Amino acid sequence: MPISLGQAFARNFLGNAPQWYKAAILLFLLINPIAFYLDPFIAGWLLVVEFIFTLAMALKCYPLQPGGLLAIEAVLIGMTSAKQVKHELVANIEVLLLLVFMVAGIYFMKQLLLYVFTKLLIRIHSKTLLSLAFCLVSAFLSAFLDALTVIAVVISVATGFYAIYHKVSSGKEFGNPHDHTDDDAVNELNRQHLDDFRAFLRSLMMHAAIGTALGGVCTLVGEPQNLIIGEQAGWNFGEFAIRMSPVTVPVFICGLLTCVLVEKCRWFGYGAKLPDAVRRIMEDYNRYEEAGRTAQDKAKLIVQAAIALWLILGLAMHLAAVGLIGLSVIVLATSLTGITEEHSLGKAFQEALPFTALLAVFFSVVAVIIDQQLFKPVIQWVLAAEPDAQLALFYLANGLLSMVSDNVFVGTVYINEVKTALLNNAISREQFELLAVAINTGTNLPSVATPNGQAAFLFMLTSALAPLLRLSYGRMVWMALPYTLVLGLVGFFSVEMLLGPLTDWFYQAGWLVLDNVAPAALPVLH
């Protein structure tokens, strides 16, 4: 039946998204200019809530399009400027380079990753031990590498596992080409196993994601905001780890205990075991790969292992920007394994580029937060508090704001304000260093509550794997909830009760030396 041009425009708008979703986005676009005219501050927070809505509905429509429309309108009506958006993008160029090059680099190491993790999956029969292994490995890697890189590895591995089983359950051989996004060919008898396998992979993904937060908070190079805070406090790698330890050690231990508890008790969507049918297929796949592995294949694995070593050393020692190391991985991995066709290279960039564009939209929202000073009332309230109450309030304020905004931005804002207070002699050097710990742990730990707070979580939510595993925004929040409560509360208790006394003990033991000379330069805010 022919349709009018107007109906065609309506159908084309946001494609296959539900009609109610399209209506909601149009309503947002209509309301925002009116709200901005009446009260810019309220309009700013309204935009933040709307953007969170687009993330929450990621399985209905990829957030880039609706979020991008909201961001474009925000610039047009004056909530922020194109110059401020560009400033945010320039300030975060390393994150953007990382997404463009590092994620693509990991793609060319899939053979090695599948080889290692298939062995791990087959040999560890206990789901609890396997979950703990994923959490620990992610935590260890995230202490030295960027969390986005670690999540890219985990996504690559999980996608590989999913594709293998999906291919066999669709009646195909290991060597046959297959589209693992299409369930139509999956045998009816295998659908329950496929659903169980999805639940199994979902839980492993979430344990690994939490592991990146547990490890990332511990060291100077673990997260971008750690570097900013550590630089302003004048801490080296060792001093940073020691100063954070009164909070990070109890949190790390309790985080691992939570991993065991939720698996054993099958709470919050955890506890799904690997179906026997899937395990047999993985074992068959392992034997198939071993039998068919040629000298060239072995050479590729050796090359990829050497590149993995370079990747870890390069990132841990900060030999270059993360994205540039990723570019070197692409060049080395492709040239030494014989991948030279342009279309073969292009596949590697398919996963990361949509998210890179989405992150640019996210930074546009951060630009609105800055220009409309949405966090200013909270910051002023915390700084006006008594010194004894400041540690807990800084931790809580950072945690709450990091749940809705980029934790790098939140950490930078607060360390700026605290540094200003130090230079104006409003607080002592001792108080400044304790507050720096509270800010760092506050931005890193409670932010696991939602995908908004950590770029690695957002990357996982918007990856091509998330819809395959039925990993929605709501499900991520639900599965993160036990970790949010444990990490947040243990972190709060440690900041309030342990940080001061243990820091004093470190001074007495000679592990730390108080530097009364404050650095003169303020960090540059995004």
UniProtKB/Swiss-Prot annotation:
Q: Where are the transmembrane segments?
A: 25-45, 52-72, 89-109, 130-164, 204-224, 242-262, 307-327, 350-370, 391-411, 448-468, 479-499, 505-525
One Pfam family linked to the record: NhaB
Q: Quickly give the catalysed reaction.
A: 2 Na(+)(in) + 3 H(+)(out) = 2 Na(+)(out) + 3 H(+)(in)
InterPro entries linked: Na+/H+_antiporter_NhaB
Q: Which superkingdom?
A: Bacteria
Q: What is its main location?
A: membrane
| GO MF annotations, alphabetized | sodium:proton antiporter activity
- Main role? Na(+)/H(+) antiporter that extrudes sodium in exchange for external protons.
The record's annotation in NCBIfam families points to: NhaB (TIGR00774), PRK09547.1 (NF007093)
Family, per entry: Belongs to the NhaB Na(+)/H(+) (TC 2.A.34) antiporter family.
This protein's name: Na(+)/H(+) antiporter NhaB
Gene name linked to the record = nhaB
